[in-house]
Amino acid sequence: MKDILFFYGLECPHCVIVEKHVDKLISEGINIKKVEVWNNKENDEMMMELDKGDDMCGGVPFFLNQNTGKTICGEATYKEIKNWAQGK
């Protein structure tokens, strides 16, 4: 099973809020890989490569489920992220 990717920026205020939800979900056993893009050119290039098509976010926070191809763009609640990660 592939990771769910969480793209974020260290200084992004929306990302700080969402990252708290991500950390809780990781502690509950949900497989999420955190990928910082504002200070890492390689990670930013990876996000740009993956953030394409009709569901394009164009920024952070950005979630990509590599198994389903589904995304979440922008600030989301803990419940929204958990339900999405579990395919609900």
Question: What does each model-found stretch correspond to?
Answer:
Residues 1-33:
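Local sequence-structure signature of Cys/Sec-based thiol-disulfide redox active-site neighborhoods
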Residues 16-20, 45, 76:
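Generic recognition of short, well-ordered alpha-helical segments
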Residues 48-64:
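Structural micro-motif
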Residues 40-50:
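N-terminal beta-loop-helix "entrance" segment that forms/cooperates
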Residues 13-14, 41-42, 79:
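Short alpha-helical
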Residues 59, 64-88:
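Non-catalytic, surface beta->alpha helical segment in thiol-disulfide oxidoreductase systems
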Residues 12-15, 57, 73:
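Disulfide-bonded cysteines in secreted/extracellular proteins and peptides
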Residues 34-38:
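Residue-level recognition of beta-strand->loop/alpha-helix junctions
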